A protein has these predicted regions:
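Enriched for short, Lys/Arg-rich terminal
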Residues: 2, 82-130
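Basic, Lys/Arg-enriched alpha-helical interface segments
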Residues: 1-90, 128-130
Length: 130
């Protein structure tokens, strides 16, 4: 039995903007069911936070890092640069029920970078510092 890592998990402002965008989309899609669906998403994020605190490498390798298209390669490089800015060498994705969370991590620290719905291919990444 392995000992829990108890890594620090934090979110950057862009991740919070992604949560707000998800809420706005839910409101647009169906205003009456949006509060319940958003509450479910929040619960999934809290559960993901607990999992990543226990095992930072729980997610799958970020698939878009091997993109072949020009746009995909651009986004992959943007994400790598963002991870380097936070000093976290690994980029991974954690799949929730209908969303995918992109995060950077080391053994003791996890940074939630952004989140997207399961359908779109692209993440809404912030611009890295120059």
């Amino acid at each position: 039995m392995s000992i829990p890592v108890n890594a620090t998990v934090r979110a950057v402002p862009n991740f919070l903007a992604c949560l707000q965008a998800a809420r706005s989309f839910m409101d647009t899609q169906n205003a009456s069911s949006a509060p319940a669906r958003f509450k479910k998403l929040q619960a999934e994020v809290l559960k993901a936070r607990a999992l990543l605190s226990f095992a930072p490498a729980s997610g799958r390798p970020a698939r878009f890092l091997d993109a072949k298209s020009g746009w995909g390669q651009f986004q992959a490089e943007q994400a790598r640069q963002l991870a380097r800015e936070f000093g976290r060498p690994e980029l991974r994705e954690l799949v929730l029920a209908h969303h995918v969370v992109l995060y950077a991590h080391s053994q003791r620290d996890v940074v939630l970078l952004c989140m997207r719905n399961e359908r779109p291919l692209a993440y809404r990444l912030p611009k890295p510092s120059a």
